[in-house]
Amino acid sequence: SRRYEKLPVSIFKEQEDASKMIVDDIIITANKKINEGKKCVLALAASSACIPVYEDLVKAYENGRLSFKDIEIFSIDEYYPLERNELQTHYRFLKEYIFDLTDIPQENIHCLESSKMDDVAAYCNRYEEQIKLSGGIDILITSGMGSNEPGSPYNSRTRLITMNHTTRVSAASDFF
């Protein structure tokens, strides 16, 4: 049987107002987790739509409202196969907008490997296990649904997918 979630939705006239609310929610969640002796786990997309949120997160860090020392970050998707430091990787994007601008320890950064590998399915299972060992995802920031293409099961996890034509056209600007 299908389950339908009832998620609270906020609609904002200005993108800046939405970004500030999201960052405030992250700060509240992070402080709560840290006060419980746990790390806050964020799952982040590499999308231009997320840049205002990431810029506000960096401002919060610079203003002393947020430290990334007890925050773990998981990337939610990646192009495959690309070498990690190629311009188009989501790792590079997150490095430019978050990792290099905050005090996040390297060991708290979990990005999907994008270079060619022998057993992608086993790697994806290990990535899911890392998320589980970290306590699960507290907050997900995305502009889509982690490249869930039409036909993807609603309960799907980390996996290799083939992007459909519409997604490829949308992503093409990353490569030119």
Task: Please state what every model-predicted region is.
Residues 1-41:
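N-terminal glycine-/serine-/threonine-rich phosphate-binding loop
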Residues 137-147:
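Hydrophobic, aromatic-enriched interface-forming segments
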Residues 1-6, 66-139:
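Ligand-binding beta-strand-loop-alpha-helix segment within the catalytic cores
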